[in-house]
Amino acid sequence: MKKIFLMRHSIPEKGDMPNERIPLSEKGKALAVSKRNILSKVDRCFSSPYRRAIETAECIADHPVIVEELHERTIGDAREDFWLKQYEDYDFRNPGGESLNQVKVRMKTAIDSIVGQMEEGETALVVSHATAICAYLLSYCEIEVKDAVDKVRKISFHGKEILNGRFQPADGFELLFENDAFSDICIMN
């Protein structure tokens, strides 16, 4: 059995800068550090190349490996109703952006590669982004939008409710892999 903690980055700074360069806020750093106890026994750590994800990973583990494919979904030229539309049609994308299906394939390729690098019995932390993580989970889970304005989702796996609410900063999922195949998921506690 192999285990991955698939975690959303912590709370970012607010400001006007390129998405990939946004750092963690002081509150975000403190929240990430508070996750150390839960994640103290990880054998490996991987991160999106975005600064807020790297900083989250570095608050928890030493020397995270940067995996380009773990980056957030490219939004492109966003429209007002974009967030809901992407869940109504997984192939929907803004001009210049990625669809959830495109992100799902990219994320699944990255995580399958990470699982393939792990030894039996190892645990890894993977820090990424809310939409990228939810897109990956579409490979195995059902995702239902409960409230598009507040970005409330219900995520289920084989009829078992995993999350019913907002996917908060520094929250995540515990994924289990048997013979390198996805076998179970629960919320990260």
Please describe what each predicted stretch is.
Residues 2-65, 98-101, 169:
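Active-site-proximal alpha-helix that buttresses catalytic centers in soluble enzyme cores
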Residues 4, 120-130:
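Generic beta-sheet signal
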Residues 12, 132-133:
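Short active-site segment of divalent metal-dependent hydrolases/proteases
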Residues 39-41, 114-122:
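Glycine-rich phosphate-binding loop signature in dinucleotide/nucleotide-binding domains
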Residues 47-48, 105, 127-128:
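Short beta-strand scaffold positions
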Residues 59, 135, 139:
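Active-site signature of alpha/beta-hydrolase-fold catalytic machinery across serine-
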Residues 60-109, 163-167:
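Phosphate-handling substructures
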Residues 73-82, 88-89, 120, 138-189:
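Acidic, low-complexity terminal tails and accessory targeting/binding regions
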